[in-house]
Amino acid sequence: MTTSSIRRQMKNIVNNYSEAEIKVREATSNDPWGPSSSLMTEIADLTYNVVAFSEIMSMVWKRLNDHGKNWRHVYKALTLLDYLIKTGSERVAQQCRENIFAIQTLKDFQYIDRDGKDQGINVREKSKQLVALLKDEERLKAERAQALKTKERMAQVATGMGSNQITFGRGSSQPNLSTSHSEQEYGKAGGSPASYHGSPEASLCPQHRTGAPLGQSEELQPLSQRHPFLPHLGLASRPNGDWSQPCLTCDRAARATSPRVSSELEQARPQTSGEEELQLQLALAMSREVAEQEERLRRGDDLRLQMALEESRRDTVKIPKKKEHGSLPQQTTLLDLMDALPSSGPAAQKAEPWGPSASTNQTNPWGGPAAPASTSDPWPSFGTKPAASIDPWGVPTGATVQSVPKNSDPWAASQQPASSAGKRASDAWGAVSTTKPVSVSGSFELFSNLNGTIKDDFSEFDNLRTSKKTAESVTSLPSQNNGTTSPDPFESQPLTVASSKPSSARKTPESFLGPNAALVNLDSLVTRPAPPAQSLNPFLAPGAPATSAPVNPFQVNQPQPLTLNQLRGSPVLGTSTSFGPGPGVESMAVASMTSAAPQPALGATGSSLTPLGPAMMNMVGSVGIPPSAAQATGTTNPFLL
């Protein structure tokens, strides 16, 4: 043991260094030889331990900071760091990249020994190589893969030798075979490989007994590891003991340039570097083929997924187009159906919806629903046939559908309620009966066709006839009613003309009322038009009561009869010159008061004047004779004789 080794061990004990630190100190010592590979392998294995990794790296950085005569510490630390980067944990390379400036500063390391030799050049070159390796990522990966493969082989060598009780010499990574050591060295190490088959002299060939080297490689292993079924150089392999030919070990060593660690599975291992390269290329090709197959499968899946997405997208685009194309035939079909509907003739194409000669099948311009067809006014007038049919059960339009007759006073329709005010006070149908006949018989109603009813085949001709007979019916009705006391509305000439036509589809009041027709006085529902002299307030509501007192329509032109006091005080009777002289009213009053006999006669005379009053008034109203003269000629007053 050298002095430096003793001093190092003393420092380890005093400073209480750990096992990892002790190994790093030994690998980076100041001895004139380099660090052993076995020691560096142990340190590399310790880098996978977190605690040991920190201890190893701290000691390595401490060694890199030395200078001067301790240049070997720096150089060996760089060598150890290079080995740890390639075979140790990946954290070593990561930490070296983080502290790469500490390695770059070593490119300027200077030291010249006593002999004038520049020893710092070794440190400078090693630091440059290490910095270049750390900066080149691809090169670092390749170097690391190669170093890990070599380390695995070294581990297999140690395992194979340990199974055959073969140990390495202290301080050397080479096996203690006879190629480099004497037989005494095997005894110190624990025996020779051939100790299990007899003496080494009998098991080895003469060439081996002389200590000739088996090969040039340091990794040469015994043949028993490669061929376990054949005893290594035993007598069984040489039954006759003929050693003239070289043994199998010598022949194998002569042909093999790079022997491998052997076992039962070593039969498949390559024997040469060419076979190794061939197997490596074959493995790479197989791996590439598997990767390409996986890539093809993945691309096929992606392609099928893309095709499915495109198909789904096309389907979603086609569906709205089909809907749009499908809606066009429906619209054209509806248009064809509308065109195929029968038209109502030339009258249906008129632009004016309010024309008097409306078509038979005219539609409602307001879009309202059509009412039941073939319905008529249940209260027809005695003038003409209705020009349009009206629904009696529809919306009550008595206040709004009071149209004005053609060629007449616009306020004539509102004058009729005043002429029959007495009858409307007790008749609930008065408002309808006084307005509808005039509106229907002698005028065109603006909204008569809005109820949706359908006319008969002769309605167009009826409109033409009613327009001609409107003036005659309006002018003839007052003259007929004034000439007769009780005219029959159903025996008038216009009604006879209208009844001569086929009206099987029309309804009559009797058919509308049915068996209850006898309960309704139809004469009271038809009234005579009011004389034009009378007028009403045009702003009065149609349903409001009349302002004038109820008047008997049959006694409109009859004045009130004169009483006895009026007859006595009237100067007309006394001053009449048409019928001769006679006593005055005063003489008649005196005679009636003084004589008792003439009182019954006067009473009879007075009673006879009362019933004659209406006839005389009627005669006055029709002929125009003054009432005073009519009374003088129509009575036999004894006082006037």
Curated annotation (Swiss-Prot):
Ubiquitinated. It holds the Pfam family ENTH. Its main location: cytoplasm. The modification Phosphothreonine is found at T508. A 1,2-diacyl-sn-glycero-3-phospho-(1D-myo-inositol-4,5-bisphosphate) binds at R8, K11, R25, N30, R63, H73. Sequence repeats lie at residues 352-354, 364-366, 377-379, 391-393, 409-411, 427-429, 537-539, 552-554, 637-639. SMART domains: ENTH, UIM. Residues 163-214, 255-275, 340-425, 470-512 are annotated as: Disordered. The keyword Ubl conjugation applies. Residues 275-294, 300-319 form the UIM domain. Residues 408-421 have a biased composition (Low complexity). The keyword Ubl conjugation applies. Keywords: Cytoplasm, Cytoplasmic vesicle, Endocytosis, Lipid-binding, Methylation, Phosphoprotein, Repeat, Ubl conjugation. Residues 352-639 are annotated as: 6 X 3 AA repeats of [DE]-P-W. GO terms for biological process: endocytosis; negative regulation of sprouting angiogenesis; negative regulation of vascular endothelial growth factor receptor signaling pathway; positive regulation of Notch signaling pathway. Belongs to the epsin family. Binds EPS15. Interacts with ITSN1. Binds AP-2 and clathrin. Interacts with UBQLN2. This is Epsin-2. It comes from Homo sapiens (Human). The lineage of its organism: Eukaryota, Metazoa, Chordata, Craniata, Vertebrata.
